[in-house]
Amino acid sequence: MEKYEMVKDLGFGNFGLARLMRNKQTNELVAVKFIDRGYKIDENVAREIINHRALNHPNIVRFKEVVLTPTHLGIVMEYAAGGELFERISSVGRFSEAEARYFFQQLICGVHYLHALQICHRDLKLENTLLDGSPAPRLKICDFGYSKSSVLHSNPKSTVGTPAYIAPEVFCRSEYDGKSVDVWSCGVALYVMLVGAYPFEDPKDPRNFRKTVQKIMAVNYKIPGYVHISEDCRKLLSRIFVANPLHRSTLKEIKSHAWFLKNLPRELKEPAQAIYYQRNVNLINFSPQRVEEIMKIVGEARTIPNLSRPVESLGSDKKDDDEEEYLDANDEEWYDDYA
């Protein structure tokens, strides 16, 4: 940790505090997610690190390394100076159709890359999409704590994610196709960009998860009259918001849809994207750490050392009261009626 110096706090996420730090040797800014040593270093954390390390795509935040402090495990990654896409939408209310398409195109290309590596994210949302600091912002997917690799793991069974973005089949307590669930979440993200609200939440009662689940299961959504979007866009949403995942649009179908292809930037077209799918490119190790070294550090982080003297605290792990709520396999009561 000695090679990094503190710049500022970035806030709390799923696992703990994130900080902006500077590499004292290269002057490069990085984001570091700090997680308490001990019981919090669980399967989700290990999975996030291993899945993240394997990724090399411009629409995915790049993993750099893990570091260990006396009290925390630090996950060092690329810093996205533009902040969350959610914050950008919140500041303007909603996007024009053209702007929403611009970000949706990048989101789909990033998710398509994940799926090509047999990784499903399972918690795609606008808060987990960051922007770089360029004038035409590049979208970057982050936070792989809930991700599952179909190569290393069985099909997902647990109910995880953020309620407003969850697909109907996730509530059925049986195995589901994580890739199809990601497609549904991308549709929710597109809707929020266009409308400035969640498609299946009651704006008068947004914390009523049972009502949200009812609307999700019934695919009960509408586009308000004040939102003027093209027929092609409406049709795309209707093909994504399909209760039966077998009938839902696939990423391949979305990428060939007329609305998606309109004004598609050259770097997102198939010839430019092809390089990221070449086996030798994905084997390039952008992190100086080998998997064995990473897992050794993660293993050490599961123990809390006896400290002979006080060390600097990173601050409270208490999350903000208004932070987004998450579901996991133990949050069963409110969706019992839909299993």
Swiss-Prot record:
Domain of life the protein comes from: Eukaryota
Where are the active-site residues found?
A: D123
- Location of region: Disordered: 308-339
Q: Has the keyword ATP-binding been applied to this entry?
A: yes
**GO molecular-function terms, A-Z:** ATP binding; protein serine kinase activity; protein serine/threonine kinase activity
Q: Where is the signal peptide?
A: none
What InterPro entries has UniProt attached to this entry?
A: Kinase-like_dom_sf, Prot_kinase_dom, Protein_kinase_ATP_BS, Ser/Thr_kinase_AS
In the record, the note on similarity to other proteins reads:
Belongs to the protein kinase superfamily. Ser/Thr protein kinase family.
Output compositional bias ranges, type Acidic residues: 320-339
Give the protein name, as stated in the record: Serine/threonine-protein kinase SRK2J
* Regulation: induction: By salt and osmotic stress (at protein level).
Residues forming the Protein kinase domain are: 4-260
Q: Which reaction does it catalyse?
A: L-seryl-[protein] + ATP = O-phospho-L-seryl-[protein] + ADP + H(+); L-threonyl-[protein] + ATP = O-phospho-L-threonyl-[protein] + ADP + H(+)
- Tell me which residues bind ATP: L10, G11, F12, G13, N14, F15, G16, L17, A18, K33
What GO terms describe the biological role, i.e. biological process, of this protein? response to osmotic stress
Q: What class of enzyme is it?
A: transferase
Give the species this sequence originates from: Arabidopsis thaliana
Tissue-level expression reads: Expressed in seedlings.
List the keywords (alphabetical).
ATP-binding, Kinase, Nucleotide-binding, Serine/threonine-protein kinase, Transferase
What's a GO cellular component annotated to this UniProt protein?
Answer: vacuole
Enzyme Commission number(s): 2.7.11.1
